[in-house]
Amino acid sequence: MFEQNQKTIFVLDHTRYFSIASEDYISMDFLKGKPSVDTGTGAGVGGASGLGTQFSKSLWTCACESSIEYCRVVWDLFPGKKHVRFIVSDTAAHIVNTWSTSTQNMSHVMNAMVMVGVPSRSMPQSSDYSVIHGLRAAIEALAEPTDEQLATIASGEPVHIPNEGRVICITSARDNTSMKSLEDIFNTVLIQQNALAGPPAKKGLAIDHCHLVILNIVPLGVESLVTNRGLLNISPLLDVEIHTVSAPDISHKLTHLILDHYNLASTTVTNIPMKEEQNANSSANYDVEILHSRSAHSIACGPDFSLPTSIKPGATYETVTLKWCTPRGCGSADLQPCLGQFLVTPVDVTSRPSSCLINFLLNGRSVLLEMPRKAGSKATSHMLSARGGEIFIHSLCITRSCMDEAPAIGDGPGGRVTDYRTTELGQLMKMSRMVPLKAKDPTAPGLPRRMPRYFPLTNGSSILFHLQRHISWMPHFLHLLVKEDMDKQEEVRCQQHIHELYKSASRGDMLPFTHTNGARLKLSKAKDQYRLLYRELEQLIHLNATTVHHKNLLESLQSLRAAYGEAKSEPNSSLLRSYTESPHSPERLEPIPSGGSSGSNSNSLLKASKRRMSSCGQRSLLDIISSAERSQANKRLDFSGRLCTPLGQVAKLYPDFGNKEKDSLLAGTTAAPNVKEESIRS
């Protein structure tokens, strides 16, 4: 309830230095007619030159305007919820307003600032004029309870009332040493105030934490010796950040700070059609920047949308760019549920585009805003409308609504995947179900590691599981392969199915499948189809080879693969990877190159498979990676310098480089063939 932005206090330096000009000159062309004729004195009407009259705001005016604009945004977006106070400091601290609701308004603050006025240049240069008086008063103001805190105290609940706040000090310091002294004084006074808040004095509330923001203001074009510094924790009670900014840019800086202080976002409504003042028959497009809660964008954006952001000239913060949508008739298909509404306030409330947009909305009209999708199209994501004299931005639901029915898993996300193996996944979950046992089962740890190692999520990502839709005996055959307790009769039945596949391959029958993994395949040859099928079948049997019957099936399949010519090099290994591999695919079993007859190929395959089965449980991931690196290194010759140099010594790179005798010998050997060629030609 009581957050850090509940209390914000502006401390404005009212010393003599703030009476100087900001050096940002504004041209004032008050004559619409022709420029006055130069009489030779170099001045025209009113003492102005041909360029017109120019004036510059003082540092005090820049500080007052930007700070009042800060509190206007706060009071527009959080009416009656967030409090802002002003303290003017010169020889003493002058309180502009209090935490009372009657003084938390723009008219009271502006009237008080008019009474304070610009600092006089004839003000004496004395140490009595200091911003420290205002900082002391700001700490005392933080200890004063607001109306909400007083209501909590009056309720009689014995709870600790959080009391945090933020102090924004607009001053001008000479160097970093002066800034360090301000921090130390502020921290000391803060500790003293908390001591007074405790018993027996009990003067005000204890300050749990304070955020001090110091804005060091300098005229335009003047270099400052004070360096910028991000948020720094000075003590458990105090965080300090320092910003050095020129006077004309202080409004942009405070707008940037208010975004973080109150979790706001900036949105620029672009391409607003507006009639020109000079020519009512033509119109131009204008942009209006508005501020609102950051949640207006976060709750509306989904994964298919990206916020278009940009940085305005002179600003340091990003603004979201939304395009004005031309009003059109909305049918039932265009109606969208609203996810939330948030108050809106313009950044430049006095500009003509802002006033036109505000009047347009206050007259009962609504504005739809568009944002782009990642695919390139656009969607209506927000709407501006007014109710009760206040303007709101509505976040529209541009993704799947919570009121829509959830899609079935068979439809897939967005209807892109439709062949999920939901039934098989349910069976796998039932088979992998674990229950607590009183005694340890030695076979229990191996079961969850073995079963989910290869499970294609869709039928289209596997040839083997894709065929069970078209071959009647294939589902029962796959069920027998993954059984943990296969008997001899089931082994014979599986052997028959494997031989049946071999007979079909010998006849050249095409397998009854069309496509896999959503791609159009070019497997016109039956040999390519059966090669991929055999390799995936071997992987599945190898993963479930826990009994003697499984191992017999594996040996039989490998013998058939060798007889069918699978022991040769595989040109379509990339096809196999695209078909059979999934995130849970096992390591591929590469065949051994053949060097003789089919019988020797079968024996070598059987020996290799037995060697793999005996060592698969003992090899670690490091062993697998090391063996792969060694096999890759053995394919190419090592560096000759490493081979010829004894161990422990450094090989010399290009040892014959620069050896003149060696070069002369090489030149002689190259010249001899040339002489011989000339003698032959002659």
Swiss-Prot record:
GO cellular component, one term: nucleus
Coiled-coil region(s): 517-570
Comp. bias (Polar residues): 571-583
Pfam families, per the entry: Mat89Bb (PF10221)
Role according to the record: Component of the integrator complex, a multiprotein complex that terminates RNA polymerase II (Pol II) transcription in the promoter-proximal region of genes. The integrator complex provides a quality checkpoint during transcription elongation by driving premature transcription termination of transcripts that are unfavorably configured for transcriptional elongation: the complex terminates transcription by (1) catalyzing dephosphorylation of the C-terminal domain (CTD) of Pol II subunit Polr2A/Rbp1 and Spt5, and (2) degrading the exiting nascent RNA transcript via endonuclease activity.
Subunit structure comment from the entry: Belongs to the multiprotein complex Integrator, at least composed of IntS1, IntS2, IntS3, IntS4, omd/IntS5, IntS6, defl/IntS7, IntS8, IntS9, IntS10, IntS11, IntS12, asun/IntS13, IntS14 and IntS15. The core complex associates with protein phosphatase 2A subunits mts/PP2A and Pp2A-29B, to form the Integrator-PP2A (INTAC) complex.
UniProt name for this protein: Protein asunder
